[in-house]
Amino acid sequence: MDKFTTLEGVAAPLKIINVDTDMIIPKQYLKTIKRTGLGKGLFSEQRYKDDGSENPDFVLNQPAYRNTKVLVAGDNFGCGSSREHAPWALLDFGIRCVISTSFGDIFYNNCFKNGILPIRVSQEDLDKLFDDAERGANATLTIDLPNQEIRGPDGGKVKFEIDPFRKHCLINGLDDIGLTMEKKASIDTYEDKLKRERAWA
């Protein structure tokens, strides 16, 4: 998992509340267990028309937001059914941070496991970030995880809270396997001790 310290990039405004995981990645893309290639399915029912052509009105199809790294979204983002493909699709598209007032619990947890930073902010702060994100090509936000703050294009700052353990994992790029390997020396020491004490086993 890639480390997450400071992220600077274009932020796209998605002013829709209750975006569920089926909207993020529709069910027809769930057949694969690969984490790559799912970016094409991200918001596919909003990004594409019935004939397969792009919907120019959807924010991620607009030139200023095609390479967005940050998504500023409406309340209760990622609600609905459990599907880890949702953060996979966001990550494959290039999005590493989602900012909202609240998230679906399972989606929120899955984001951390896949190297995406979900940030909860107040409605007042979200409205300010929407204003920043609506600047198009100038909608650059800086996400400073070590200092737990979001910096806008005009230098304005929004502070955010994060669980210290999850912060540690993101900064060091630790997924479940990485966490285990971080404790490898302790595990090896314990196993050696066990072998000595239970040589008969």
Swiss-Prot record:
GO terms for molecular function: 3-isopropylmalate dehydratase activity. Pathway: Amino-acid biosynthesis; L-leucine biosynthesis; L-leucine from 3-methyl-2-oxobutanoate: step 2/4. Its EC number is 4.2.1.33. It catalyses: (2R,3S)-3-isopropylmalate = (2S)-2-isopropylmalate. Pfam families: Aconitase_C. Signal peptide: none annotated. Keywords: Amino-acid biosynthesis, Branched-chain amino acid biosynthesis, Leucine biosynthesis, Lyase. The keyword Amino-acid biosynthesis applies. The keyword Metal-binding does not apply. GO terms for cellular component: 3-isopropylmalate dehydratase complex. It is an enzyme of class 4 (lyase). Heterodimer of LeuC and LeuD. PANTHER family: 3-ISOPROPYLMALATE DEHYDRATASE SMALL SUBUNIT, 3-ISOPROPYLMALATE DEHYDRATASE SMALL SUBUNIT 2-RELATED-RELATED. Catalyzes the isomerization between 2-isopropylmalate and 3-isopropylmalate, via the formation of 2-isopropylmaleate. Belongs to the LeuD family. LeuD type 1 subfamily. This is 3-isopropylmalate dehydratase small subunit. It comes from Bradyrhizobium diazoefficiens (strain JCM 10833 / BCRC 13528 / IAM 13628 / NBRC 14792 / USDA 110). The gene is leuD.
